[in-house]
Each structure stands twice: as structure tokens, then as C-alpha cells.
């Protein structure tokens, strides 16, 4: 299972601190949402070497990602175009109906994060996300860090989102959205907290595993061996 983290300068902990803590908690990998924290894996650089070193040192996968937080769909589209070829995982922050719609209708987007952040998510968006292979994030951070009315509202949003996503079989990811290594929770804690408020345990595990599945798929697509889904270049195949 994987967790998707915010690292310095966007978060309060370095990638190394996140990796060390996540490994200790039993994660197989982390997805680093913060673009500035790691250079793209496609480029040979000090940061790329650091990611490899972290994998070697902690035995945990470190995935370069970007979380695009744009003011509108036009700006988000430009950012997706800029980062898709460089980043292993591309996320778009929701926040209004226009951004949510853009994200689920754009196959180059891997994950729509925080879809209830200021807009709404309905059956039309759920079907579009399913058809375009865009995962919808369930941010469980409020289960651990919010209190009072804010926590109640977040839970209501999560339950509404779950009903729509499960009904239309929309792909999903799950995260506690940690901004510090102190915010990280072991997979079993995330599952237990979600189960306590009515979520199916295996469904939550699927959402934690999905981050790694997205990374694996995208790495394969970027490799020279990839031709199309289900077909790889063999030793006797050449470009036409």
C-alpha cells in the first residue's frame, strides 16, 4: 500500500523523513505530491539520484508526482500539458465544478484530489471519471485532524462521495493527505478509522494500493518496452 504525501517546501517534512516513517509503518511506497521536492524521474539529476537512494536505503518506493492547484480549468489544462510527460503521477486539485469536470474528462489526469473542496461531485462526473480512468481521491485527513462541525461536514461529504463512486464503479484512491511525517498513519490505522465511520475495510485498502498501481502503469507506459496495453516490444520486434 502507498500514501501520497506533501513534502518540503509544500509540507513540513522532507521526502527522506516521510520515506523513513512510511517504511516503518509498513507502506510499500510514497507518492510525493510536491513538485519542488523531487525532480522528475525522467531526468538524471541529484534529486532523481536521491529518490533512488531513498528506495535503496529504506526499501520503499518513492514516486515523483505533481499536484496541480489551478484557479480554473484553462490554467489546469496548461499545467497538465507541461507536467504529464515529466511526472509519473499527475493530480489535479478540485475546488469548483469547472475544475472537477475538467479533471474527470481529461485522460492525462491520474487523480482528482479533494473533489469536495468547494464544488460538488455528481453522477455525471463519476461516469466521466470511470470512462477516462481518472481516480477520485478520498481524503481521510479530517478523520485524524479535524474536530467538531468541520469533521462532521467532512464525513458527510465523504459518505456522499462514496455512494456515488461505488454506484458507478469509479476508480478511487485513499489518503490521509499528510503534510508532515507526524501526520502519517499506518495502513491499519487508516483502515480502522475509515471502517469506524462506515467504510468497507477492503475498499479502503484498494484505495491505498491504487496509488502504487497508477505509478506502475505510468512507468510502464513511459518505458521503451511499451507499445500498447497488453503488448510489449519483444527481442525480435523493431520499429516499422
Swiss-Prot record:
Domain of life assignment: Archaea
The alphabetized UniProt keywords are: Cytoplasm, Endonuclease, Hydrolase, Nuclease, tRNA processing
Its recorded name reads Ribonuclease P protein component 3
Task: Name a biological process GO annotation.
Answer: tRNA 5'-leader removal
- GO MF terms held by the record: ribonuclease P activity
Q: What does this protein do?
A: Part of ribonuclease P, a protein complex that generates mature tRNA molecules by cleaving their 5'-ends.
Q: A Pfam family matched by this chain, by name?
A: RNase_P_p30
Please provide, in alphabetical order, the Gene Ontology terms of the cellular component aspect for this entry. cytoplasm; ribonuclease P complex
Species of origin: Halorubrum lacusprofundi (strain ATCC 49239 / DSM 5036 / JCM 8891 / ACAM 34)
Q: Might you give the EC number(s) for this enzyme?
A: 3.1.26.5
Main location as per UniProt? cytoplasm
The gene name reads: rnp3
Subunit structure, interactors included: Consists of a catalytic RNA component and at least 4-5 protein subunits.
Signal peptide, first to last residue? none
